[in-house]
Amino acid sequence: MSLKRLGFQPLACKRDMRRPELNRDSGWLIGVDILVVFLGLIGQIFLSRSLLSADYGLLIILLDAFATIFILVDAGLPTLLNRDGPKAPGMARKAAHRILKLQAVIALPFIAIAFIGSTVIWGDLPFGLLGICAAITLMHVASYPHRSLLRCLGEARIEAMTKLLERTVTTSLYGCLMIFGINEIHWWALAFFIGAMLGLISAIIFGEKVGKNNQGEGSLPELWNSNKSLLMGALPFAVTLGVLPYVTKLEKFLLSYFHSYEDVALFHVAQLAWLAGLLVPQGVRAALLPVLGEARTQEQLITRMSKAQSLGFILLPVGLFFGHVLVSNLIPLAFSNDYVQAVEIFEILLAGWALTLLAVPWYVGLQAGPHPWRFTGLLGLVVVSAFISGMLLIPEYGVTGAAWSSVCGSAVMFYASRWMNRTKLPQQIWLDVSAIICLATGYLLSTGNGLAWIGIITVIPAGFSIVEIRHQMKNSEEE
């Protein structure tokens, strides 16, 4: 099926080429990601109702463990393409090919490490199950170069559709397995494998088609001149990616060590809803990185960061309200009684979601700036703080302690990213007020306290931000 029939018409003419744009691209990424997460939640409901809690928790740990290993194959290279590609659209496709070749070489030692490590830790499990789980995470990593290619060429909408295709196929296959009463864990892993494979194939096909039709002047930075300089330039992002999985997976690893796979499954259900909401700041981040990377002056950088901050203020009360209402009703309705406590855990995680959303302009500014190692250091601080708090809280308080450990990591990201970036943006007072209000709201919601309604205060900076964005749009039209 052609892109034109789907309504996507990437044009070769330079004046008609799409460029990265924050509101449009984040709208596509967030909008489709909401559908992806909705389908993902349905898939998790199928999983939790068809597999024993122990098997469900085991599958989660297997996928998380392989993802933690193979994310290093990424080497930070697609992030570089996402940052530098908008400056040289005519060279972006060749850059994606180059990244894939480098990643194929990098993957070899990590495949060996994964094979040896998995057979030692889970030697009693079928090799086929381990192989399927490993292949799933490898295919996800292999899809990143072409998805970054699409995004840096202004086609975040097509990137989003490849994700939707993958999740639709996976969830549909999960539904078939549930209907036929299949409860063997390897069949469910195979369904995920098929979805990931189709997601990879679609990303490559559409990325190649869009890349061929893009022309444009400009050249990639000097670090792209050789593989050595390219890998060194991507090293901060590679180290970051090595740390990044622990930001969302560390608590589950600690729970599996100190408690049980059943507790991992309970925390995972709560975290699913949290990760669903986390796609909002991730969508803004994904759209903001090429926009900041394209900024030529400090004034442009501040203007674009300020716009992202305003967007965060607007999304904050919406996320708090709908997150609480939807999850508090959805989890008891969709999951068995074994997972009812996940609502309380989610309310705690909701505070961490808010802090992550508010931190987006600052940590993306670090990522796109001249000192990307600062972003690596930031994530290192987040993981260390989450690990220390997890070691203190999880052995004693279990799943609840894991939730507060996650919030501690988000709080460190919020405050440390602002301190490390040091960019001055408007509404700083409201930023601090919103953070404190969100922390209090998460705690009060988790305890069932009616004072949780103080979260409505976040509507005030949202109103100011709407006025500011309208003013910016009016000035843009006049120009």
Question: Across the structure, where does each feature detected by a protein language model lie?
Answer:
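Alpha-helical transmembrane segments of multi-pass membrane transport and lipid-handling proteins
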Residues: 2-6, 73-74, 97-125, 132, ...
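Signature of the first transmembrane helix
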Residues: 3-9, 21-78, 111, 115, ...
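Interhelical loop/hinge segments that connect adjacent transmembrane helices in multipass membrane
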Residues: 6-18, 131, 157, 185-191, ...
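Membrane-water interface segments that mark the loop-to-transmembrane alpha-helix transition
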Residues: 24-36, 62, 67, 71-119, ...
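Transmembrane helical elements of multi-pass membrane transporters/channels
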Residues: 25-40, 166, 170, 191-211, ...
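Helix-loop junctions and terminal segments of transmembrane helices
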Residues: 73-89, 152, 270-310, 363-368
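Membrane-interface junctions at transmembrane-helix termini in multi-pass inner-membrane proteins
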Residues: 84, 139-162, 293, 350-381, ...
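Hydrophobic transmembrane helix module of multi-pass membrane transport proteins
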Residues: 101-240
